[in-house]
C-alpha cells in the first residue's frame, strides 16, 4: 500500500533513529514510546527483516505470542511482549491460494518477487468453533484480511503448516481490477451468531461474513439489519479501521484516493462511528478535528496515567494518538515529557497487552514508517516526571 502524505515530522522521525525511546521521564500525563522490533538495524533492540509495514496485531487470551501482519512481505510474524521472535511465521495467500515466493522474506525492491506477496492488514484471534479453516474440520485460530480482497484462516495442524488458507475471495468482486480492498477486520456476535466484519475501502462498505454453509468451506457473505449506514459521512470517505470495543464496533473513516485503494492523509480527514453488531448506527463518535486517516482503536487500561480507561484512536496520517471520553469528547493527544505530541510514523494498530511476556496495562503498537517501507513493533507507557 502506498500512502499519500507530506514529509515526516521531526517527532515521528525519532521512532527510527538509533535511540530506543521517544519521550523521557515524565509526569503521569506524559508518555514514552519504546521500540521493540524493527526491520532496520539500530531502530530497535531487536531486528527482523520480515517486519515490513507491520499492521494488524492479535493474540489469544491464553497468552500466545503477538501475531503481527507484515503487509509488505505477505507474512504473519510472532513475538513475545519483549520483542523476542518466535520461530513460526505464516505465509498469507494471494487469490487462488497462491503463495508468493517472496512471502515471509525481506522485500528486495531491486529484485521484487513475481507475483508480489499478499498484503495482509487486519487480523483477529478466533474463539469460535464455527469458523473453520476451509477444507478442514479444524477451527481457525487466526483470521487475516488483505488489501488483495481476501480473508484467510490459519490453525495449528495444517499441511503445509506455515500457510494460511483462503476463506473469502472478493479480489474480483464486482469485477477484475476493482475488487475488494480490505483494510481492517473485527469479530462480533449478535442474535444470529458470530460474524466477521471487514472494512472494504474500495466499495465504501462493511462486508460481513458468517461461517461456511457449503462443501467448499468458504465463509458466507451475510447481511445485517442495519447495514452499517451513516448518511452523513461525506462522499469520498470509506470505512478504514474497525475494532470491537466492549461489544460495539468502532469504525473509522478515511478519505479515498482516486483509485479507492489508499487513504489521503490530512488534518481533519477522518470520522469515527459506533455501530452495534447488527449494523445499526448508535452514534457519531468523532468528526474531523485532529483526526488524520484514523485507523487504530483501543481502550486504555485503568493504569495508563492521566488517560486511564479512555478511548485511544491513532492517526495513520500523522502518527498522533487522540484521546476521547466515552461520549466522544476529545480530551487531548498523547504527549511526551516536553509537551510534544507523541507521533509514530505510519501508526497502525493500538492494542492492550496480553500476549506472551506482556502486561495488560501496556499499550502495544505496530507501524509502517517511511511510507510503509519499514516496520516497527513497540510499546507506549506513562512515565512520571515532566521536563
Model region roles, listed by residue range:
Residues 23-387:
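Sequence/structural signature of beta-propeller domains
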Residues 1-12:
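Bacterial N-terminal signal peptides that target proteins for export
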Residues 11-19:
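Bacterial N-terminal signal peptides
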Amino acid at each position: 500500500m502506498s500512502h499519500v502524505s507530506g514529509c515526516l515530522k521531526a517527532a515521528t522521525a525519532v521512532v527510527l533513529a538509533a535511540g530506543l525511546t521517544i519521550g523521557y521521564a515524565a509526569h503521569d500525563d506524559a508518555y514514552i514510546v519504546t521500540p521493540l522490533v524493527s526491520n532496520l538495524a539500530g531502530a530497535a533492540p531487536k531486528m527482523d527483516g520480515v517486519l515490513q509495514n507491520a499492521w494488524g496485531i492479535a493474540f489469544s487470551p491464553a497468552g500466545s505470542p503477538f501475531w503481527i501482519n507484515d503487509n509488505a512481505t505477505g507474512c504473519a510474524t510472532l513475538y513475545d511482549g519483549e520483542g523476542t521472535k518466535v520461530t513460526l511465521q505464516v505465509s498469507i495467500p494471494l487469490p487462488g491460494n497462491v503463495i508468493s515466493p517472496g512471502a515471509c522474506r525481506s522485500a528486495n525492491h531491486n529484485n521484487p518477487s513475481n507475483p508480489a506477496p499478499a498484503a495482509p492488514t487486519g487480523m483477529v484471534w478466533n474463539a469460535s468453533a464455527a469458523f473453520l479453516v476451509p477444507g478442514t474440520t479444524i477451527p481457525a485460530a487466526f483470521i487475516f484480511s488483505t488489501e488483495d480482497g481476501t480473508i484467510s484462516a490459519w490453525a495449528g495442524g495444517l499441511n503445509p503448516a506455515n500457510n494460511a488458507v483462503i476463506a473469502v475471495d472478493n479480489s474480483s468482486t464486482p469485477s477484475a481490477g476493482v475488487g475488494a480492498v480490505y483494510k481492517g477486520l473485527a469479530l462480533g456476535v449478535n442474535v444470529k451468531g458470530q460474524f466477521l466484519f471487514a472494512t472494504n475501502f474500495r466499495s465504501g462498505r462493511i462486508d460481513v461474513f458468517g461461517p461456511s454453509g457449503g462443501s467448499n468451506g468458504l465463509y458466507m457473505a451475510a447481511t445485517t439489519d442495519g447495514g452499517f449506514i451513516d448518511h452523513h459521512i461525506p462522499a469520498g470517505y470509506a470505512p478504514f479501521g474497525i475494532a470491537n470495543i466492549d461489544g460495539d464496533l468502532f469504525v473509522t473513516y478515511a478519505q479515498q484516493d482516486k483509485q479507492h485503494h489508499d487513504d489521503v492523509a490530512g488534518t481533519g480527514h477522518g470520522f469515527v462511528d459506533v455501530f452495534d453488531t447488527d449494523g445499526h448506527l448508535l452514534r457519531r463518535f468523532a468528526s474531523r478535528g485532529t483526526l488524520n486517516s484514523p485507523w487504530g482503536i483501543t481502550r486504555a487500561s485503568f493504569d495508563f496515567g492521566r488517560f486511564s480507561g479512555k478511548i485511544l484512536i491513532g492517526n495513520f496520517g500523522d502518527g498522533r494518538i487522540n484521546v476521547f471520553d466515552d461520549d466522544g469528547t476529545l480530551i487531548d493527544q498523547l504527549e511526551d515529557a516536553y509537551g510534544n505530541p507523541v507521533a509514530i510514523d505510519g501508526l497502525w494498530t493500538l492494542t492492550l497487552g496480553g500476549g506472551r511476556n506482556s502486561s495488560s496495562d501496556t499499550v502495544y503498537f505496530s507501524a509502517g514508517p517511511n511510507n510503509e517501507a519499514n516496520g516497527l513493533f513497540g510499546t507506549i507507557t506513562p512515565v512520571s516526571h515532566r521536563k
